[in-house]
Amino acid sequence: MVMEKPSPLLVGREFVRQYYTLLNKAPEYLHRFYGRNSSYVHGGVDASGKPQEAVYGQNDIHHKVLSLNFSECHTKIRHVDAHATLSDGVVVQVMGLLSNSGQPERKFMQTFVLAPEGSVPNKFYVHNDMFRYEDEVFGDSEPELDEESEDEVEEEQEDRQPSPEPVQENANSAYYDAHPVTNGIEEPLEESSHEPEPEPESETKTEELKPQVEEKHLEELEEKSATPPPAEPASLPQEPPKAFSWASVTSKNLPPSGTVSSSGIPPHVKAPVSQPRVDAKPEVQSQPPRVREQRPRERPGFPPRGPRPGRGDMEQNDSDNRRIIRYPDSHQLFVGNLPHDIDENELKEFFMSFGNVVELRINTKGVGGKLPNFGFVVFDDSEPVQRILIAKPIMFRGEVRLNVEEKKTRAARERETRGGGDDRRDIRRNDRGPGGPRGIVGGGMMRDRDGRGPPPRGGMTQKLGSGRGTGQMEGRFTGQRR
């Protein structure tokens, strides 16, 4: 009887089931999956803030696993990718949530390279194992979102919450129900990761939705008028000329559809242009365009384009204006990797040695105390900022290395944000296209979510004490025979 070679996906799924089951029930035997030449790295940072280095060999991996103190380790697998690699090996990528010793769940990414064991067909061992927590990898990029003047970010969210958020949630839920897992990117996890890059796309959706809401409002006001249709087309033909003034900034974010002309930016400029056409009508019809002029003027004042100090015509309170235009970016310094027990007075005294500190604030990340804090320091001059940047690395209390960076200009943040958003949208389009691999993994590792239980366990068995390892302490798993 000819033995069929199992597919990489079948090998990957069975390995994932065995590996995380052993991690939960008997982590002290986890090293049996590895061999003499295996490498193992587990997410974490040392005292200096650098990522932990890999360990090699089954014995060192055993000590490393014991030092991690795995106890009642529960894992929720969200996605598994498995592909064939060199020398008949299989590379497996796992994404999900991990909770150890009753701690809150944390998103993780783990990659295995499974090498074939020469003595037995369809038998593999872990040659490389790389594990990282997502919040440790992307933690340093989060403060850039807060750099955009926290006050104006909160104001933008308050203005935009009523319209765009339900649309995004409906879109995500529809995509989630259709195919929970795709080949490489899982959309629900992507949206919940709090990454700042997709913001331009939601901004565009927001700007597209607001004129529609305003037009409905105007239609209700114009029902009492004799001819409501001419009032709306009057503004539409005039919008393209204004769009050219923003083309160099927003062309990357505007979709190539008919909704470009109805973006939320130009309408407040179009209303005065359309007035001469409306003035030819009775005076009753001239009122709705004036309402149209007033309403959009409050919202487009907040997008982070153009110089902030020159916008004195925005009807904001004085305290908000003072916070936005008080100090230039060259006087401000971003400080990351702050200890949790630090207070503002201690940090201010530390930076007073470089120059006069006029303002300081510390932000706490809400991840259950797992991540270091970050903050912003404002000097009365740009020279202390440059001295600190030249003097890097900056050591606090003699043992904590602070991550200090100059506050980036608004143009640089927009370029980075928009560039990342375009690439991410392209990836999502490719993943959501027809004929995609949604059916390959959807019925396998996602069974826990649907309540149908894990895959059948009769396919592969764990064999201990043979192969390339160190005698009885080395474990292997084999593919099923068909």
UniProtKB/Swiss-Prot annotation:
Residues 247-264 have a biased composition (Polar residues). SUPFAM superfamilies: NTF2-like, RNA-binding domain, RBD. This is Ras GTPase-activating protein-binding protein 2. The gene is G3bp2. Residues 404-476 are annotated as: RG-rich region. Residues 140-170, 187-318, 408-482 are annotated as: Disordered. Transmembrane segments: none annotated. It comes from the Eukaryota. The modification Phosphothreonine is found at residue 227. GO terms for molecular function: molecular condensate scaffold activity; RNA binding. Under physiological conditions, G3BP2 adopts a compact state that is stabilized by intramolecular interactions between the RG-rich and the acidic regions that inhibit phase separation. Upon stress, polysomes disassemble and mRNAs are released in an unfolded protein-free state. The modification N6-succinyllysine is found at residue 392. It holds the Pfam family NTF2. The modification Omega-N-methylarginine is found at residues 457, 468. GO terms for biological process: innate immune response; mRNA transport; protein homooligomerization; small GTPase-mediated signal transduction; stress granule assembly. InterPro entries: G3BP2_RRM, NTF2-like_dom_sf, NTF2_dom, Nuclear_transport_factor_2_euk, Nucleotide-bd_a/b_plait_sf, Ras_GTPase_bind_prot, RBD_domain_sf, RRM_dom. There is a cross-link at residue 281 (Glycyl lysine isopeptide (Lys-Gly) (interchain with G-Cter in SUMO2)). Residues 433-445 have a biased composition (Gly residues).
